[in-house]
């Protein structure tokens, strides 16, 4: 019976230390590390979300310029000419908005007040599902005429168009200010000389 007393005393002596250790919880350093990790993950999530949204906006433009290309080819097959709808591939010439930004979308189908003389977008067999964010331009010419503009730039690469095209031609452009805090704009191009779509995105 006497032999059991020291053993019980030893257990009793250790118990407060164990309880005190559990009660202490995380240290300040450990909490700071957790906060930093959460902050980093939050930043990565926001950046990833913004990139995803931007890519979805650009996909609207790439799909639309391809649709305009198909509509131009259908129009040419019927009339033997491409539709020279826009006054140019230039700022202020786009439709349905002359100053498109990511802050709003604009309905397609309204009368084009800044189109080339006598032309309207409704002349193209083009189906648009709803309002669009980008503004769109398309210019065209006959064989032997020079492309206007003669070239465009996409992410540092210069794309040069023929000075005297051997065939009838067209150029399609989409433009939008996706980041309204800077003057840089995003452009998407295609043309009758290539099936490629070029994206010039400053981000």
Each language-model region and where it sits:
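N-terminal leader/signal peptides at the extreme start of proteins
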Residues: 1-26
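Residue-level recognition of hydrophobic positions within alpha-helical transmembrane segments
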Residues: 20, 26, 56, 68-69
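N-terminal single-pass transmembrane signal-anchor helix
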Residues: 22-53
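Periplasmic/extracellular, small/polar-rich flexible segments of pilin-like filament-forming proteins
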Residues: 2-3, 78-203
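Alpha-helix exit/C-cap motif
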Residues: 50-56, 69-88
């Amino acid at each position: 019976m006497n032999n059991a007393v020291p053993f019980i005393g030893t257990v009793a002596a250790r118990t407060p230390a164990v309880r005190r250790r559990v009660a202490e919880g995380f240290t300040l350093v450990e909490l700071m590390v957790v906060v930093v990790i959460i902050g980093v993950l939050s930043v990565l999530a926001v950046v990833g979300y913004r990139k995803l949204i931007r890519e979805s906006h650009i996909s609207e433009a790439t799909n639309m310029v391809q649709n305009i290309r198909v509509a131009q080819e259908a129009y040419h097959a019927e009339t033997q000419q491409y539709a020279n709808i826009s006054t140019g591939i230039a700022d202020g010439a786009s439709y349905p908005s002359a100053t498109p930004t990511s802050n709003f979308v604009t309905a397609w189908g309204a009368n084009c007040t800044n189109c080339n003389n006598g032309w309207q977008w409704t002349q193209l067999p083009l189906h648009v599902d709803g309002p669009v964010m980008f503004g769109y331009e398309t210019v065209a010419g006959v064989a032997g005429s020079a492309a206007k503009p003669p070239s465009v730039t996409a992410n540092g690469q210069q794309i040069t168009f023929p000075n005297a095209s051997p065939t009838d031609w067209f150029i399609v452009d989409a433009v939008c200010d996706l980041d309204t805090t800077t003057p840089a704009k995003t452009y998407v191009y295609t043309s009758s000389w290539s099936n490629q779509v070029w994206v010039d995105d400053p981000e």
